[in-house]
Amino acid sequence: MKHTEQFHQKHILVLGLAKSGEAAARLLHDLGAIVTVNDQKPLADNPQAQKLQKEGIHVVCGEHPISLLDGKELVVKNPGIRYDNPIVEEAIKRGISVVTEVELASKVSEAEIVAITGSNGKTTTTSLVVEMLKGSAREPKVAGNIGVVASDVAREATADDVIVMEVSSFQLMGTSHFRPKVAILLNIFDAHLDYHGSKENYVAAKKKIVENMKEEDYFVYNADDPLVSKVAAETKATPIPFSRSTVVKSGAYVDGETYMFRGEKIVEKGDVVLPGDHNVDNVLAAMSAALLMGATKEQIHHVLSTFSGVEHRLQFVGTAFERKWYNDSKATNILSTTAAIQSFTDPIVLLAGGLDRGNSFDDLIPALQKVKAVVLFGETKHKLAQAAMEAGVETIVEAERVEDAVRKALDVSANGDVILLSPACASWDQYRTFEERGEAFVTSIEGLQE
C-alpha cells in the first residue's frame, strides 16, 4: 500500500456499510482519518457497525441526519446509495466531494489496475483476465464488483501484482482520479436507468473509466458498439479495438476460425469451450488485456480450452430428468437474456422475472419467439407474460418464486429440453442478490431428485 498523507486528520463520512463501506472505513481509519460511519440499519441489528465501533470508529446508525455533513471534507458512498438520497444531494450542494470505495483503492494501490466495465459480460471477462495472467510475471488479484472489496485488495497488493477489477457504473460514477493501466469497455446498453435517471447519465458514468488515462495506458474497446467507439475517440489512452465482425489490425478480431491479436494467431475458435456467441466479445477483450499485461499465448490457450464459464452466468448445472438445466441468474437485463436464449438450439423452457424497474419487455419479444415455454415469477411476471403472448409462446405459466418455478418448468418440459433460468430482471423483489436467486434454482433442482 502506498504511504499517503492525503487522508491524515481529514474528517470523512462513510455512508452505507456492507462489505465495501466497512473496508473503506477501516482503511481510512488506519490512514489517520477521523472517520464517521453512517448506516441505515439500527446499531442493535448491525454487527458490522458494532465491530467498527469497538475499533474506535464513530458510528451513527438508524437514520441519515444531514448534520453528519458538518465539518466533513469527503464522503465515501456505498455504490448502492443513489445520488438523489437527501444526504448525498446536500453533500454535493455544499461542495463536499462524494466518491466510492474504488476511488480509495486506486489512490492507495501500488499495483497497476486492469479495470473492466460494460453493461454485460463484466464478470466473465474479469475472470478470464485473472486466469490468463496466472503464471505471468505479476500475480493477478481480483477485486471490485465481482464480490471482492477493492480497497482490501489494494492495501495488500504490491508493485509486483496486478489488480483485475470489475467496476460497475455505480462505482465509476463516484470516481475523480481513478486511472487504470488497462481499461476494458465491453458494451453500452440501456441499463440501471432507475439509478442514473437517463441513458446520457449512464453513458457518462461508464466513460469515467478512461477519464484520467494517458497515452501510456491502454483502452480495450468494442469497435462494433457505436457508443463505445465514441468513447474511444475521446480518450488519451492508446486505443486497442476488438471486433467479431471486422479485421482490426491494431487489436483483436476473429479471422475465419482463429482468434487474432495484432495480426498474430492466438487460439483456434474450436479450442474455446466457453459457450455462446456473446462470449466471443469477452474472449477478445480478455486476451487483449492479458497480452498487454504480459500473459503468454500458451497460458491464454490453456485458459480458453478449459474455462467453461462462471457461476450464475450461463452455468451448466447438470442433467436431471433428461433435461439440461442452466443457471443464468446474473442475467438482470433484456440483452443478457437475449444472448442466453440465442446460445441454444434445443427447445427452451425459460424461467424469468424479478424486480420491476418500470421498463418494457418489447425488446425481448424477438428472442422469446425461440422459446417453447415460459415460467414467470416476481414483480414483472405479468409484463413478461404479455411479451410472451405477443411472441407467440405456446405455454405461459406463472409461479410465485424460483423454487416454485423449477417444479412447473419440469412439468411443461420434455426430454432433451433446455431449462434456462435467465430472469432479465434484478432479484431484489424476492432475493437479496442474484447469487441467492441462482442458488435457490440449483437447490430446487437437487430437491426434485430426492
Swiss-Prot record:
Subcellular location: Cytoplasm
Enzyme class per UniProt: ligase
Main location (coarse class): cytoplasm
Catalytic reactions of this protein: UDP-N-acetyl-alpha-D-muramoyl-L-alanine + D-glutamate + ATP = UDP-N-acetyl-alpha-D-muramoyl-L-alanyl-D-glutamate + ADP + phosphate + H(+)
InterPro entries noted in UniProt: Mur-like_cat_sf, Mur_ligase_C, Mur_ligase_C_dom_sf, Mur_ligase_cen, MurD
Keywords, comma-separated and alphabetical: ATP-binding, Cell cycle, Cell division, Cell shape, Cell wall biogenesis/degradation, Cytoplasm, Ligase, Nucleotide-binding, Peptidoglycan synthesis
EC numbers, comma separated: 6.3.2.9
Pfam hit, one: Mur_ligase_M
SUPFAM superfamilies: MurCD N-terminal domain (SSF51984), MurD-like peptide ligases, catalytic domain (SSF53623), MurD-like peptide ligases, peptide-binding domain (SSF53244)
Pathway annotation: Cell wall biogenesis; peptidoglycan biosynthesis
GO biological-process terms attached to the record: cell division; cell wall organization; peptidoglycan biosynthetic process; regulation of cell shape
Entry annotated with the keyword Cell wall biogenesis/degradation: yes
One term under GO cellular component: cytoplasm
Molecular functions (GO terms): ATP binding; UDP-N-acetylmuramoylalanine-D-glutamate ligase activity
Task performed by this protein: Cell wall formation. Catalyzes the addition of glutamate to the nucleotide precursor UDP-N-acetylmuramoyl-L-alanine (UMA).
Family classification: Belongs to the MurCDEF family.
Protein name: UDP-N-acetylmuramoylalanine--D-glutamate ligase
Species this chain originates from: Halalkalibacterium halodurans (strain ATCC BAA-125 / DSM 18197 / FERM 7344 / JCM 9153 / C-125) (Bacillus halodurans)
Phylogenetic placement of the source organism: Bacteria, Bacillati, Bacillota, Bacilli, Bacillales
GN (gene name): murD
